[in-house]
């Protein structure tokens, strides 16, 4: 009996342990089934896709707004640039117009200044011509006295006879006396010729005129025959000499005044004008001294006068040879006539009135020509010409000193004069036809000289006009060249600025295009990354879904396998019950009642996913406090891990364990309930979720009063527990 009690106690302990394990499994199954509906993963993927789509739409809207802002900014920049270009073009146009107006004003001022200079020059020339053409109130008498010499002026060499300068080596001493003043005049004219350059044509004319003519020799011989005494040829009183000197001094003052006026007009030729005035002054003094020496009333004073002058006249052939080498302006080959040659008695006749305007006209032309020569050709003198002029001036000064000292000198020795020629004494006067012919010859020579001077003047004026035109043309060309250079420079500057602006614009557009491409590339990369992320999320969601489906299929397969195993177990259990039912009814006949009233075994298993399913076992016990039967409900869930699947017992072993000896009628069963301060979770919760009645923790003696043992119930309980485990 003790052995049977120990065996039943071991079975109860194992049943309690199995119930604990089943409670834990049921609790874990409930926790798993309770957390599944809270977080559905498929709905989360849809929400993520929807949120991603919303974010993408929002980003597209932001990009569109940003692109609109960029386009507006570019439009404003383009409008600002165009406005800046318009303002710049307008400023350049205004500057160009101002420059053209300024240039036109400067050109107008320059033209007015040229006009004023031209008018002033014309006025000066006109005043000079008027002053030169003003008639001089002088006595023009043809006499043997000093009045004849009063109309002869240093500034009018054209009225002198040209043929009287053709001095040759005559032997007549009377001719030497008469030609003393002519030699002095020739010395003065040679001084001018040294300073003035002669053309070859003019030099040939001068050489031809230097040869003496037959009429001159005949007139000289006739005059010498008429005048027995040299003193009677010039009955000049000291008073007339003084008058002549005063008149010549007045003429010299006028000449110096006109020369000073010309010098004031030409300030840049002041040095040349000064030299010219000095030379004219020396020549005037020399001529005046010669005149004074020739017309002196002392016969002794007139005799030695030709000696120093005759030395100069003897050097005339060499002087004529050197005229071609003098560097002076052309147009001045005027050979003055004799200054103090008294006419022959046959030539004494009144002066014609028509010669005076002609002489005045020649004088005016001569002064105008002299002014032009001083203005245009004064700067062309060379150092050689200056040296020769200085030598000539020294010679003139020496001759003047000799003339001044001549009254106190003794008469010159006759060896100094040329050998005397045979005197031809002829009575009577010179033929009037010869005098007329000589006068016409003089007029013809004067006319030719005047025409030649007029032609030279026209040539000089033409040359000056050409020079002025060339100068104005050069000035205009230079101005045009400067304007063209300025225009080219401005054009190059404008092109450079336009190129810089175009380059800046292209650079700005290129930077904008690069920035736009960079932003588009970044946006495309971001969109690509977003698409890749979405694809990765979709793949992950698909993988999770497939894993869940596989997991569900595996669980379903496991559930079906467990169901099959349970069905097999239940089949074996029914067979065992069918075998053991008949002996139990025979031995304990009252057990069937108890089973019908207080105990029911439900073996219909439920699926493991249902929380309320599972076989239930109702065991009737008696409460120790009240003695009333208490119903205990045990829920057994067939969901167990695969590691517990190997704990199934063999049917034979189960038969041995459940098979009890029915020989012993006196059997008591002790049920071991779980011992602890806290009941199991399966016992604490029933199907409705409410607390079950309290279970006593102390062991209960079954059937204590009646002493009846229920082996069938115990065997079923133990067998069921073993099979489930």
Swiss-Prot record:
Q: Where in the cell is it found?
A: Cytoplasm, Perinuclear region; Cytoplasm, Cytoskeleton
Q: Which residues cross the membrane?
A: none
Record flagged with keyword Chaperone = no
- Give a Pfam family name: MAP7
Region annotated Disordered sits at: 1-73, 86-163, 261-539, 575-631
Q: Which residues form a coiled coil?
A: 71-131
Q: What is this protein called?
A: Ensconsin
């Amino acid at each position: 009996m003790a052995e049977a009690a120990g065996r039943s106690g071991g079975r109860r302990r194992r049943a309690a342990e199995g119930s604990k394990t089943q409670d834990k499994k049921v609790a874990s199954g409930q926790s798993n089934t309770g957390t599944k509906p809270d977080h559905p993963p498929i709905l989360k993927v849809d929400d993520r896709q929807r949120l991603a789509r919303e974010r993408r739409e929002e980003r597209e809207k932001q990009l569109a707004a940003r692109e609109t802002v960029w386009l507006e900014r570019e439009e404003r920049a383009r409008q600002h640039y165009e406005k800046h270009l318009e303002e710049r073009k307008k400023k350049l146009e205004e500057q160009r117009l101002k420059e053209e107006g300024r240039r036109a004003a400067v050109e107008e001022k320059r033209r007015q200044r040229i006009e004023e200079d031209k008018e002033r020059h014309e006025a000066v020339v006109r005043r000079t011509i008027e002053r030169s053409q003003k008639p001089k109130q002088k006595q023009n008498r043809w006499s043997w006295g000093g009045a004849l010499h009063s109309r002869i002026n240093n500034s009018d060499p054209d009225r002198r006879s040209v043929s009287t300068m053709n001095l040759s080596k005559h032997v007549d001493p009377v001719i030497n006396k008469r030609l003393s003043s002519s030699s002095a005049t020739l010395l003065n004219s040679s001084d001018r010729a040294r300073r003035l350059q002669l053309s070859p044509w003019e030099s040939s004319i001068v050489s031809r005129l230097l040869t003496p003519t037959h009429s001159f020799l005949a007139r000289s011989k006739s005059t010498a025959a008429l005048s027995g005494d040299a003193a009677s040829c010039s009955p000049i009183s000291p008073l007339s000499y003084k008058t002549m000197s005063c008149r010549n001094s007045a003429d010299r003052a006028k000449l110096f005044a006109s020369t000073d006026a010309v010098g004031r007009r030409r300030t840049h030729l002041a040095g040349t004008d000064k030299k010219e005035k000095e030379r004219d002054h020396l020549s005037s003094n020399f001529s005046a001294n010669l005149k004074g020496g020739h017309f002196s009333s002392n016969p002794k004073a007139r005799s030695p006068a030709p000696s120093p002058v005759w030395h100069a006249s003897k050097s005339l052939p060499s002087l004529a040879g050197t005229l071609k080498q003098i560097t002076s302006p052309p147009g001045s080959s005027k050979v003055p006539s004799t200054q103090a040659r008294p006419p022959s008695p046959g030539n004494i006749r009144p002066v014609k009135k028509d010669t005076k305007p002609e002489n005045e006209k020649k004088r005016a032309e001569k002064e105008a020509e002299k002014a032009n020569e001083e203005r245009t050709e004064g700067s062309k003198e060379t150092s050689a010409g200056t040296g020769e002029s200085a030598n000539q001036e020294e010679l003139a000064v020496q001759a003047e000193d000799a003339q001044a000292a001549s009254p106190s000198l003794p008469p010159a020795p006759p060896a100094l004069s040329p050998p005397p020629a045979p005197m031809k004494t002829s009575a009577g006067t010179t033929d009037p036809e010869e005098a007329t012919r000589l006068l016409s010859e003089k007029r013809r020579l004067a006319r030719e000289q005047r025409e030649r001077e007029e032609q030279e003047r026209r040539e000089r004026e033409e040359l000056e006009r050409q020079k002025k035109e060339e100068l104005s043309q050069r000035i205009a060309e230079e101005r045009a060249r400067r304007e063209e250079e300025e225009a080219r420079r401005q054009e190059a500057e404008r092109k450079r600025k336009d190129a810089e602006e175009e380059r800046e614009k292209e650079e700005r557009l290129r930077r904008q295009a690069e920035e736009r491409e960079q932003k588009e590339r970044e946006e495309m990369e971001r969109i690509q990354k977003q698409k890749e992320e979405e694809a990765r999320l979709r793949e992950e969601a698909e993988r999770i879904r497939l894993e869940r489906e596989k997991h569900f299929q595996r669980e379903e397969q496991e559930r079906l396998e467990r169901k099959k195993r349970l069905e097999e177990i239940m089949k074996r259990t029914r067979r065992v019950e069918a075998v053991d039912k008949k002996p139990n009814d025979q031995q304990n006949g009252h057990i069937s009642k108890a089973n019908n009233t207080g105990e029911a075994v439900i073996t219909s298993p439920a699926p493991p996913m249902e929380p309320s399913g599972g076989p239930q076992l109702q065991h009737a016990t008696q409460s120790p406090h009240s003695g009333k039967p208490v119903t205990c409900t045990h829920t057994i869930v067939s969901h167990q891990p695969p590691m517990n699947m190997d704990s199934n017992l063999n049917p034979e072993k189960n038969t041995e364990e459940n098979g009890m000896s029915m020989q012993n009628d006196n059997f008591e069963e002790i049920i071991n309930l779980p011992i602890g301060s806290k009941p199991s979770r399966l016992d604490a919760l029933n199907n409705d979720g409410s607390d079950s009645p309290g279970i006593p923790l102390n062991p209960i003696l079954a059937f204590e009063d009646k002493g009846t043992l229920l082996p069938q119930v115990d065997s079923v309980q133990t067998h069921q527990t073993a099979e489930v485990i």
